[in-house]
């Protein structure tokens, strides 16, 4: 049995005990993951995760903070707004992956007070968005930051996001298209994501599928169903569009909603 499987079998009390102890950093790491996976609302769990954002004991060989990363990820899934300010502070972490996880969780929490700190990570624009020296990633988690700004509704960041449409990395361009559609509702941004479904690289087609699902772009339904990618991902994308559409139609199933359901049925 793997460590993940063992952790999954924990009870709430075991997970809380494991994150509170200090001798075994591995157990603390898995406990943070456990709280996020099971969306635990227990106040002890929330407080332990908030404390874990400042942990100094669990360090990776490259100087990173594994426990902080998992804590930041989990706090977004719990939906507790008490995490907003600590996550904003985590955007200044020296660990790229902590910053990335914090941005993703702030997107989930959707609190507008995170906007200035997220915008700050776009400082320098595309010219500054280069590979970190000796690392496999860029200097900032631009994809996560741009997506968060779009989801939160940071219209003040439109001018800062637009230049990223020309970034050399496709996923960052897609993030910019996604955010700009969310912030402007201009169809040409979503249509460019639809065009990306015809790209040569499967990984990029997958990204475009998820982005179209995230923005709820109904006209993309047919293109998503026909895309060369796993049916499971196409279903996730269509489900996202349907859920967004139902929110806009006050849960009324109209012709567009029925078509989306039919497309989903065709993929099962």
From Swiss-Prot:
GO terms for cellular component: phycobilisome. Its EC number is 4.-.-.-. It comes from the Bacteria. GO terms for molecular function: lyase activity; oxidoreductase activity. Keywords: Antenna complex, Lyase, Phycobilisome. The keyword S-adenosyl-L-methionine does not apply. CpcE and CpcF associate to form a lyase. Required for the chromophorylation of the cpcA gene product. Belongs to the CpcE/RpcE/PecE family. This is Phycocyanobilin lyase subunit alpha. It comes from Picosynechococcus sp. (strain ATCC 27264 / PCC 7002 / PR-6). The gene is cpcE.
């Amino acid at each position: 049995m793997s460590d993940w499987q063992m952790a999954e079998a924990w009870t709430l009390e075991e997970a809380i005990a494991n994150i509170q102890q200090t001798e075994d950093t591995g157990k603390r790491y898995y406990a943070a993951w456990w709280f996020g996976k099971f969306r635990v609302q227990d106040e002890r769990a929330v407080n332990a995760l908030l404390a874990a954002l400042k942990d100094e004991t669990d360090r990776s060989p490259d100087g990173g903070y594994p426990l902080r990363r998992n804590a930041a990820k989990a706090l977004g899934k719990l939906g507790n707004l008490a995490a907003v300010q600590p996550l904003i502070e985590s955007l200044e972490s020296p660990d790229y992956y902590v910053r990335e996880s914090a941005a993703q969780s702030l997107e989930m929490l959707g609190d507008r007070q995170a906007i200035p700190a997220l915008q700050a990570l776009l400082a320098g624009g595309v010219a500054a968005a280069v590979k970190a020296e000796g690392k496999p990633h860029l200097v900032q988690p631009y994809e996560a930051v741009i997506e968060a700004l779009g989801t939160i509704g940071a219209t003040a960041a439109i001018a800062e996001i637009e230049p990223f449409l020309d970034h050399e990395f496709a996923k960052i361009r897609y993030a910019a298209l996604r955010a700009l559609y969310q912030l402007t509702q201009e169809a040409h941004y979503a249509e460019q994501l639809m065009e990306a479904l015809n790209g040569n690289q499967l990984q990029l087609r997958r990204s475009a599928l998820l982005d179209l699902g995230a923005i709820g772009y109904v006209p993309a339904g047919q293109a998503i169903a026909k895309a060369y990618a796993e049916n499971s991902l196409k279903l996730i994308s269509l489900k996202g569009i349907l859920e967004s559409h139902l929110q806009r139609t006050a849960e009324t199933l109209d012709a567009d909603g029925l078509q989306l359901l039919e497309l989903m049925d065709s993929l099962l």
